[in-house]
C-alpha cells in the first residue's frame, strides 16, 4: 500500500483529506495511548535498547539497528536483536538461522540483521527478550518496539527520515503517525534523524521546536564494495518503505537508471515477478539491482542475477551517540 501524498503535506496545511480523516486519526491516537497505558512491561537482566519510530513505514530503523549492534559489539557486548519478524509465518521465539530460514518464515529484515548479530523473531516481544537473555545476550536491541509496552526499555531511540519528518503531524489515517509527536517523544530518549544536510535543515526548521529530547543526525551512504556504478545501465527494483530514496542513491552514484520499479514494502518477489523484471532488463540492456533487504527475498534461481547496493549509517556525532549507548548498556567486565 502506497502512503497518500497528503500525509507529507506541511503540518500547518495538512489538506482537506487530512482534516476529513482527523476524527479517525484521533481515535487511532487514543487507541494507541490506551494500549500503552495498559502495558505491564517485563524486565530482563540485561539492558534493552529500543529502536523505533513514530511514522508508519520505513524510516531507516534497520540500518540504524545494524550500526548500534556493531558499536555494541566493538565495546565487548554480545548483542542480540529481538524483532517481530514482519511478513514471516513463525510465531517464535525462534533464533534466526540464515542457513535454514527463509524470508517467508522469519521476514526479510531479520535475515538481513542476522549477518550482524544474533536475531530472535518473536510475535510476543517479551518472550523474545527473555529467550535472548537466556541464550547469552549481554544487551538486547528491540527492533520496532517503541509502541510495544510489553518490554521495559533502558534507552529508546526514535528514528526519523529527515526529508519526510513527521509528515503532516497527524495520526493514521489522517497522516503517517502511529501516535502524536508530543506523546511519543515524551517516552523517547533520543531522536536519530537520517538525511543529507539539506534534509536535516528542513527537519530542524519544521520540527525543531517540537523536539523535547536530544537530536543526533546521520546519513545513509553507499558501502564501498569496489562496484563502479558510473554509467552502468540498471533496472532497479525495491520493496522497502521509501523506494524513491534507493533510486535517488543509485542516480547519485552515477548509475544509468533505465527503469525504476517501486514495489510495496515487503512485497513477495515471486518467480513470475522476477521473470518479468529479468525480461525487461534484457530488453533495456540493463543490470538488475536491488536493496540488501529485498535481496534476501529473492527466489534462489535469481540470486546470482541481481546485484545489490548496500548502504550503511554514517553518524555525524559518532562519539556522542556511542557514549549514550554505553551509558545505557555499560560494557561487560
UniProtKB/Swiss-Prot annotation:
Belongs to the LpxK family. This is Tetraacyldisaccharide 4'-kinase. Its EC number is 2.7.1.130. One of its GO terms (biological process) is lipopolysaccharide core region biosynthetic process. It comes from Ruegeria pomeroyi (strain ATCC 700808 / DSM 15171 / DSS-3). ATP binds at residues 55-62. One of its GO terms (molecular function) is ATP binding. It comes from the Bacteria. Keywords: ATP-binding, Kinase, Lipid A biosynthesis, Lipid biosynthesis, Lipid metabolism, Nucleotide-binding, Transferase.
Amino acid at each position: 500500500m502506497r502512503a497518500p501524498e497528503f500525509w507529507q503535506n506541511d503540518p500547518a496545511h495538512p489538506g482537506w483529506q487530512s482534516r476529513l480523516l482527523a476524527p479517525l486519526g484521533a481515535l487511532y491516537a487514543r487507541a494507541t495511548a490506551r494500549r500503552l497505558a495498559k502495558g505491564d512491561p517485563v524486565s530482563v537482566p540485561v539492558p534493552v535498547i529500543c529502536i523505533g519510530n513514530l511514522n508508519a513505514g520505513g524510516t531507516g530503523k534497520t540500518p540504524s539497528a545494524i550500526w548500534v549492534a556493531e558499536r555494541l559489539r566493538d565495546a565487548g557486548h554480545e548483542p542480540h536483536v529481538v524483532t517481530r519478524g514482519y511478513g514471516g509465518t513463525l510465531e517464535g521465539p525462534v533464533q534466526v538461522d540464515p542457513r535454514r530460514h527463509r524470508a517467508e518464515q522469519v521476514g526479510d529484515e531479520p535475515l538481513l540483521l542476522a549477518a550482524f548479530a544474533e536475531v530472535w523473531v518473536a510475535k510476543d516481544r517479551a518472550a523474545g527478550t527473555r529467550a535472548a537473555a537466556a541464550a547469552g545476550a549481554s544487551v538486547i536491541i528491540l527492533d520496532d518496539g517503541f509502541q510495544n509496552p510489553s518490554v521495559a526499555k533502558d534507552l529508546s531511540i526514535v528514528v526519523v527520515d529527515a526529508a519526510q519528518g513527521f509528515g503532516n503531524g497527524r495520526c493514521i489515517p489522517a497522516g503517517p503517525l502511529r501516535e502524536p509527536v508530543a506523546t511519543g517523544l515524551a517516552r523517547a530518549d533520543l531522536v536519530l534523524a537520517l538525511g543529507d544536510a539539506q534534509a536535516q535543515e528542513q527537519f530542524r526548521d519544521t520540527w525543531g521546536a517540537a523536539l523535547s529530547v536530544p537530536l543526533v543526525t546521520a546519513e545513509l551512504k553507499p558501502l564501498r564494495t569496489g562496484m563502479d556504478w558510473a554509467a552502468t545501465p540498471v533496472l532497479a527494483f525495491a520493496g522497502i518503505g521509501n523506494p524513491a530514496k534507493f533510486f535517488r542513491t543509485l542516480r547519485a552514484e552515477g548509475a544509468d537508471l533505465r527503469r525504476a520499479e517501486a514495489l510495496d514494502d515487503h512485497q513477495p518477489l515471486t518467480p513470475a515477478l522476477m521473470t518479468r523484471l529479468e525480461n525487461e532488463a534484457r530488453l533495456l540492456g540493463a543490470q538488475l539491482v536491488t536493496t540488501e533487504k529485498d535481496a534476501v527475498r529473492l527466489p534462489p534461481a535469481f540470486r546470482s542475477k541481481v546485484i545489490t547496493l548496500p548502504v550503511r549509517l554514517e553518524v555525524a556525532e559518532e562519539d556522542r551517540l556511542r557514549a549514550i549507548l554505553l551509558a545505557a548498556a555499560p560494557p561487560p567486565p
